[in-house]
């Protein structure tokens, strides 16, 4: 039997006890009472704190202090001792200066939504390993940034200064910056020297500033050889910027400016560019070949521009038709001239561009009558009008007629009501789908007023709804293949019609017309109508019987209650109701008399009428029921009831 020395046994016992107590010693690290600690993550956010609590564990790596009321005086000096902290979230607090006493090795600092005005070298030099700095929504201005404030931050990659008070780009930014956001400031000028050292910059956002072409130097972006994304949205540019870095630029955003022309060399050498957006500008045409160097373009957005589809834009149609399927071009819709407004540029044929050298005259054809629709004429847009030919009346519905060389679609329209138009069509060849578009005519349309839809090839009609009453509309259809590419040599078939006027389609008239148009499904009268008619006839018969019975009994009753009319022709009964005489009207049996009243009993302008009914309680009038049949029955005296004083 092997014996273990007692000393060795005691040593191993102590080691076991120490190992058992080790987890408890780690778990016993303190956590501020107002916070919650979870393995390096310290949550002290949303607690209305005015200062950072003390006693934060030394193993903390992420401090969540956002949405409090912490000010600069509330940052304790002991915070510098937390050497493992890498991320601090101090946004939405009450800081008015760049904070000090921050941990030295912090890499990501969020200070947005404070009121920070100044950025000094002393505050930034304490955090030399900073990689991301978020200062959005503060009050930083160009003069409040100390010269050389960032010279020790050689690891800074992201700098966000959106929505501040900057008028220029800060000087002396580190060369290591890869993303710079300066959107929604007051920047009006950018010198060529302010960005020349940022050779590692990949993303530059300058949206919502006051930049125009005079405030941009010709070579301001030239040295940004690693730039992949440039955004100049919501500025005041009148022309697309030139001399852009073409080595790596992939995204260019120029929408919501005042760009009215594009220099021919604006996009030269941008062979890596795959997304270009110039929507919401004032472009009416493009110089030929402006997109020739865009070898990798896949997304081109040109929405909401007043494109004039004249001869200068014919090359655009040819370029669009030569693009591969992967290229997505949006927004090239004609706004002028009038004859092609609302049509896609890629759908136009050569004759519609008004190029005199290529223009060929198309003979006007005669309208084909149709028995189902009103008299319809030809569509004036797709033909060349001769001086001696009158323009068709736009207040009627028209049927399209095209050259007999190519007749793919024939469209018919009919105004159903003040807000709806029924469209039907016939196709000469089988097709998978058709594109249907409509636009209100008679005025310069607002951007986006053209409505489009895709209908399947097996359909032959469509109902347009929610239209304006008594308004002209243009309707166009284009055949589509299964690959969703429009036929390159096919002109859209268009037609113009008008919704019905309001006076012709009031609710009652419309209902009656619809009822007249809709035939009965069965020739027999519905059972409900038969029952309703029978009930009405029975009710009328009963009502007539009751009226006859009342009339007969009333006549017999009035013969027993006849009274003398002799005195009523010249007495003062009628006068009593108009002169306001101070008298009493007394009726005894079949006669009556006026009894004067002394002035001391009743005031001067008053009278009192006492009615004394006959002892037998009978009516005084011969036919009392006849008075209820009219509002102006006449007495024997010839005076209407409205002129008598009733009691």
UniProtKB/Swiss-Prot annotation:
LRR repeat copies, ranges: 58-82, 83-105, 107-126, 127-152, 154-179, 181-197, 198-223, 225-246, 247-269, 270-293
GO CC terms, sorted: axon terminus; axonal growth cone; cell-cell junction; cytosol; endoplasmic reticulum membrane; extracellular space; focal adhesion; glutamatergic synapse
Signal peptide: 1-28
Region (Disordered): 620-647
Modifications made to the protein after synthesis: N-glycosylated.
Membrane topology (Cytoplasmic): 548-647
Primary location class: membrane
Extracellular side: 29-526
Residue ranges of every copy of the LRRCT domain listed in the record: 305-356
Domain LRRNT, residue spans: 30-62
BP-aspect Gene Ontology terms: axon guidance; cell-cell adhesion via plasma-membrane adhesion molecules; embryonic morphogenesis; fibroblast growth factor receptor signaling pathway; head development; heart development; neuron projection development; neuron projection extension
InterPro entries: Cys-rich_flank_reg_C (IPR000483), FN3_dom (IPR003961), Leu-rich_rpt (IPR001611), Leu-rich_rpt_typical-subtyp (IPR003591), LRR_dom_sf (IPR032675), LRRNT (IPR000372), SLRP (IPR050333)
Protein name: Leucine-rich repeat transmembrane protein FLRT3
Organism: Gallus gallus (Chicken)
Species lineage: Eukaryota, Metazoa, Chordata, Craniata, Vertebrata
Gene designation: FLRT3
